[in-house]
Design a protein with these regions (language model features):
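Activation segment signature within eukaryotic-like protein kinase domains
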Residues: 83-84
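AlphaC helix of the protein kinase catalytic domain
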Residues: 65-75
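AlphaC helix of the eukaryotic protein kinase fold
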Residues: 16-34
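C-terminal lobe helix-coil module of Hanks-type protein kinase domains
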Residues: 142-242
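Activation-segment/catalytic-loop signature of the eukaryotic protein kinase fold
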Residues: 46
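Conserved short submotifs of the Hanks-type protein kinase catalytic core
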Residues: 50-64
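Protein kinase catalytic-loop region centered on the HRD/HxD motif
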Residues: 89-99
Length: 278
């Protein structure tokens, strides 16, 4: 096919000897061919019969988002937000066809030399109609939603959580729930975890962005965005209502706080005066 560059990838039994790895390789080929989206790496069907196992993908030149961030440590927050948008659009394309990526992390978001972001690696992906979905683990535990550790059903909100962890880490250099996240295995252990504001690690992160990340990173999937489209909207147009909810009461109502404090002190003074006059 003239004018088009390919990147063939062959399954090597000596490196990947187990059946799970073989199925992952086949799954990446099959799922990859189902999608033709500008923000998803293209996988092509072979033009001739296969005599050994391989897959063909478009040739990409560039770096993973992790490598890009390392090479650009001073990149502004606005640039990271700009990268988050095509990542969300790519995941939405998957979710519309009942497909979960299950391994969203900085290494699986690729930045081309032209600055375009591509979602790659479908080895851990699942399709809603496949019965083995619950038995498949997510790729990297530090990015995986709690649903995987708890062994419960998951949907697109699990990918949402992983994406939010990815960009939280890229913005701050830390994970949102600290080192104890990987130790949590039960609902009670997850309930004890506390979200750390991204603003604490990086003062350049605006409060509205931290609020959006905090919602997408809710440990309870019911508290995350129902759809990735809503997350995208809050990244494109800052949600002041969400920001207000995320701010401590004192920051939301500083004047009222000091008014109530003054009234309380006045009442205490009257009580002390009454006791002294007795």
């Amino acid at each position: 096919d003239f004018g088009r560059a390919y990147c063939p990838s062959q399954y090597k039994q000596s490196i990947l000897p187990d059946e799970d790895a073989l199925r992952a390789f086949q799954r990446e080929d099959w799922i990859g061919q189902r999608f033709h989206h500008p923000d998803i790496v293209k996988t092509f069907a072979p033009t001739r019969p296969r005599h050994y196992l391989y897959l063909i993908q478009e040739h990409l030149e560039g770096h993973s988002l992790r490598a890009w961030r390392k090479a650009n440590p001073d990149a502004p927050v606005e640039t990271m937000i700009a990268f988050a948008k095509p990542a969300i659009k790519a995941l939405r394309a998957l979710h519309r066809r009942e497909t979960l990526h299950q391994d969203v992390k900085p290494d699986n978001l690729f930045i081309t030399q032209t600055g375009q972001l591509k979602l790659i690696d479908f080895g851990s992906a699942t399709v809603g109609s496949i019965s083995e979905n619950l038995n498949l683990r997510a790729g990297a535990a530090e990015y995986a939603a709690p649903e995987y550790a708890l062994g419960v059903a998951r949907d697109g909100r699990a990918d949402q959580f992983s994406l939010a962890v990815t960009f939280y880490e890229l913005l701050t250099g830390h994970y949102p729930y600290g080192d104890h996240y990987l130790e949590a295995k039960t609902p009670n252990q997850f309930r004890k975890l506390q979200y750390t504001s991204a603003c604490k690690h990086n003062p350049h992160v605006p409060l509205w962005l931290d609020a959006a990340l905090a919602r997408a990173l809710s440990l309870n999937p019911e508290h995350r965005y129902p759809e990735l489209s809503e997350f995208l909207i809050d990244l494109e147009r800052p949600n002041t209502h969400l920001t207000l909810k995320a701010k401590p009461w004192l920051e939301q109502n500083p004047l009222l706080f000091w008014q109530l404090t003054s009234v309380l002190l006045l009442v205490c003074n009257f009580i002390l005066l009454a006791c002294w006059l007795r």
